[in-house]
Structures are given as structure tokens and as C-alpha cells.
Design a protein with these regions (language model features):
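Alpha-helical membrane insertion/targeting regions
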Residues: 1-166
């Protein structure tokens, strides 16, 4: 997408780093797979520095800490026209991945786990599919960002494009 201008190295770095937030959101779904295959915990390493930021913000601001981090990302980066379109697009895409994971987490906690139990085959399979899908989407997007390309994830990318102004 050359019509948006060339993508500088610093934009590639920041475009890659924002996906650490999506990896942090995927940590919740990693329990079953990481317990069975500890090697998968390697894929969670980029999310741990974000866990420190979230923990600090929650301790400082209470239950509004994670909302504050969301607002900083959305208003400070996505809606800031002085930041390159590439970084804003990737930030919006990681916010959408995080929202999707949060919605899945709510559905799991309030509907599926009470109905099927906490450790059945169905629940474990859902956790593993959501975890692997979110990790695959995050790492795919990180690799595309390093290469200076826009990561195209069906539906999520379309929503990100509609939210990011030119």
C-alpha cells in the first residue's frame, strides 16, 4: 500500500510492539495448552512486560486501570493524526483483537463454563483454539509489521480500516 507513504523503521517497531497487548490478552486462554506443552509458554513472552503495565495501572487506578490503558491506546494513538497511519492501524487492530478475546472470555465465564464445567474436553478445546488463533494472528501481524506490510486479518482488518482516519 504505497499510496499511504513509505513505512519507516520506527513505525515498523511501534507497529510490532502494540501486538504485545494482544498476546497479553491471550494469556488467559493459555492455561490448558501450556500445562500440557510447556514449550508454548515461549510464545507468551512478549505479553509479560504488558502484564507489568496492566498490574501497575490496576493497582494505581483500581478496576479502571485496564480501561485507562485502552483509552490511552485509542485516543492517544489511534485518533492522533500526527502518528503514522501504519502505527494507528496496527494499534486499532490489536485493540479489536483484545476486545474479541474479552468478549469470548465473558461468554466462556458466564455461559459455557457454568453449563459444561471448567475442565471438560469441550472447554479445553475452545480454550486451545482461541489461544492458538490469537497467538497466530498476533505473530502473523508482528511479522507483517516488521516487513512493513499491513496485516490483513479477515473482518478485523476491515473494522480497523473503518476506524483509522487517513
Amino acid at each position: 500500500m504505497a499510496w499511504r507513504g513509505s513505512i519507516e523503521i520506527k513505525d515498523r517497531i511501534f507497529g510490532t510492539l502494540v501486538y504485545c497487548f494482544a498476546i497479553f490478552d491471550a494469556i488467559f486462554f493459555s492455561t490448558f495448552l501450556v500445562n500440557q506443552f510447556p514449550l508454548f509458554s515461549f510464545f507468551l513472552l512478549p505479553g509479560f512486560p504488558i502484564a507489568v503495565v496492566y498490574r501497575f495501572s490496576v493497582q494505581l487506578f483500581g478496576m479502571f486501570g485496564s480501561f485507562l490503558v485502552f483509552m490511552i491506546l485509542f485516543l492517544g494513538i489511534v485518533r492522533n493524526d500526527r502518528i503514522s497511519h501504519f502505527v494507528r492501524y496496527n494499534t486499532m487492530q490489536t485493540i479489536l483483537i483484545g476486545i474479541l478475546l474479552s468478549l469470548i472470555q465473558l461468554i466462556m465465564q458466564w455461559a459455557l463454563i457454568p453449563a459444561f464445567g471448567n475442565s471438560g474436553l469441550f472447554i479445553e478445546t475452545l480454550y486451545n483454539v482461541v489461544f492458538l488463533g490469537s497467538i497466530a494472528a498476533s505473530y502473523y501481524s508482528m511479522i507483517q509489521s516488521v516487513l512493513g506490510r499491513y496485516a490483513e486479518i479477515p473482518t478485523i482488518s476491515e473494522a480497523a480500516y473503518s476506524q483509522v482516519r487517513y
